[in-house]
Amino acid sequence: MKDLQQASIHHIALGNPAYTPAGRYAQAAMEQAKVWSKVQPKIVNVNNVRQALDYVANQSTEAGFVFGTDAAIMPDKVQVAATIPTTKAISYPIARTINSKEPAAANRFIGFVRSAKGQQILKPLWFPECALNK
């Protein structure tokens, strides 16, 4: 976090903390590291994590905060400099809508995501192992 204060870092892409979870997590981490007030002038508030990723990938900013799952889709354009531990687990819910026109297909997809093969596909993309609600 302290590296964000370096003179070589002019812009930091961050999902707007007012409405993006990633932005709130990042702001809280920077506040905890006592760098938020120093780097706040460098912050470029963006609409979402993918936009922050794009800003870093196309070098519009020198740094940015994204979820590991997003950084994993551009390994040739971005490098993960640090992983920020969170005090609260980040969850990715999956569900079928009540009015689904294809409930059987939706249930099969959910089953696949929860299966060993589905988890094997998701693991390299930084998705945590599926915690099944029983």
Residues of each region from the PLM?
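Exported/periplasmic ABC-transporter solute-binding proteins
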Residues: 1-134
